[in-house]
């Protein structure tokens, strides 16, 4: 009965899940947060119960000790059932890491080097890896990269049309993100369709606060909407997605916004928040229903961008077997699904209203019977995918 511990670490917090791999059951999960602040906190769930605790947590090493204490106090026992592997989510693997990789000193140095491409994410992941190695010195640690799934993109999809020497010197290319989710969901879609993975053409729409689209052919990513960073592509909660780059030059010349201000503008003050003052899709929909014209426009922009990518990826794939919605908005918002695909019936893409309105946590069809293109809702499970990849990487 092998178990895998999955860790998703940031600069001041980390989440964890302990997963029994024979049945792929979550045995325990938790959150350690406010690391480095005067008072930190832990939350641990196991066996249907939950416990919370406040205590000083000086650093990630202390955070992992607090996690170990929670397992010792509330179970399940890590002494009786120690993990055979610990999987770490790492946002950016650049073009260095194309698959889940057992952590070595060289791997940690490479992750640190790639922090220039993901300064908000990779340093926290590295802190988590180092602390976890202290807590579990005799267990294999595996880094699973959000970007790895998209390393199969062809050159024409990942290359930006800028000076090639500058691009090479600064590692500028499309990397793509949410790869763990896109991989999990596209493989689940193939099973739901009853088709061999290598014969499928699937468009995955990962719609959460962050959002991305991917074209997956035969289980391999051939195009994706996020680029060098997670800023490109679809409209998101606070991120702009695609814009004309000259907008930044225009703002730099005609306002007092500096480089950091412009970066903050596009990452934290744009998207739905920038268009409406509201960053949550549910709030935007309520405002639109109440007649707010800005909210109505924002929803139109959001849907327009999704349709743009669905059409483009259908062309790149040479046809589509399924369009799949996943993540918080994609899984739970029937209105977004229906309106995002409205008008695509000429492509064989349509939604059955009754199926679409059904509230369920199960993977399911929301397209009519006999539809040329299946429309699916598949809950993502990035932690399980990380656990699967970690187990495979260690040979267990």
UniProtKB/Swiss-Prot annotation:
<dbReference type="Pfam" id="PF00871">
    <property type="entry name" value="Acetate_kinase"/>
</dbReference>
<feature type="binding site">
    <location>
        <position position="382"/>
    </location>
    <ligand>
        <name>Mg(2+)</name>
    </ligand>
</feature>
<comment type="pathway">
    <text>Metabolic intermediate biosynthesis; acetyl-CoA biosynthesis; acetyl-CoA from acetate: step 1/2.</text>
</comment>
<dbReference type="InterPro" id="IPR043129">
    <property type="entry name" value="ATPase_NBD"/>
</dbReference>
<keyword id="KW-0963">Cytoplasm</keyword>
<keyword id="KW-0067">ATP-binding</keyword>
<dbReference type="InterPro" id="IPR023865">
    <property type="entry name" value="Aliphatic_acid_kinase_CS"/>
</dbReference>
<dbReference type="GO" id="GO:0005524">
    <property type="term" value="F:ATP binding"/>
</dbReference>
<dbReference type="InterPro" id="IPR000890">
    <property type="entry name" value="Aliphatic_acid_kin_short-chain"/>
</dbReference>
<keyword id="KW-0808">Transferase</keyword>
<feature type="site" description="Transition state stabilizer">
    <location>
        <position position="178"/>
    </location>
</feature>
<keyword id="KW-0547">Nucleotide-binding</keyword>
<keyword id="KW-0479">Metal-binding</keyword>
<feature type="site" description="Transition state stabilizer">
    <location>
        <position position="239"/>
    </location>
</feature>
<dbReference type="GO" id="GO:0006083">
    <property type="term" value="P:acetate metabolic process"/>
</dbReference>
<dbReference type="InterPro" id="IPR004372">
    <property type="entry name" value="Ac/propionate_kinase"/>
</dbReference>
<comment type="similarity">
    <text>Belongs to the acetokinase family.</text>
</comment>
<dbReference type="GO" id="GO:0008776">
    <property type="term" value="F:acetate kinase activity"/>
</dbReference>
<feature type="binding site">
    <location>
        <position position="15"/>
    </location>
    <ligand>
        <name>ATP</name>
    </ligand>
</feature>
<protein>
    <recommendedName>
        <fullName>Acetate kinase</fullName>
        <ecNumber>2.7.2.1</ecNumber>
    </recommendedName>
</protein>
<comment type="function">
    <text>Catalyzes the formation of acetyl phosphate from acetate and ATP. Can also catalyze the reverse reaction.</text>
</comment>
<feature type="binding site">
    <location>
        <position position="89"/>
    </location>
    <ligand>
        <name>substrate</name>
    </ligand>
</feature>
<feature type="binding site">
    <location>
        <begin position="206"/>
        <end position="210"/>
    </location>
    <ligand>
        <name>ATP</name>
    </ligand>
</feature>
<feature type="binding site">
    <location>
        <begin position="280"/>
        <end position="282"/>
    </location>
    <ligand>
        <name>ATP</name>
    </ligand>
</feature>
<dbReference type="GO" id="GO:0006085">
    <property type="term" value="P:acetyl-CoA biosynthetic process"/>
</dbReference>
<keyword id="KW-0460">Magnesium</keyword>
<feature type="binding site">
    <location>
        <position position="8"/>
    </location>
    <ligand>
        <name>Mg(2+)</name>
    </ligand>
</feature>
<dbReference type="GO" id="GO:0000287">
    <property type="term" value="F:magnesium ion binding"/>
</dbReference>
<feature type="binding site">
    <location>
        <begin position="328"/>
        <end position="332"/>
    </location>
    <ligand>
        <name>ATP</name>
    </ligand>
</feature>
<dbReference type="GO" id="GO:0005737">
    <property type="term" value="C:cytoplasm"/>
</dbReference>
<keyword id="KW-0418">Kinase</keyword>
<comment type="subunit">
    <text>Homodimer.</text>
</comment>
<feature type="active site" description="Proton donor/acceptor">
    <location>
        <position position="146"/>
    </location>
</feature>
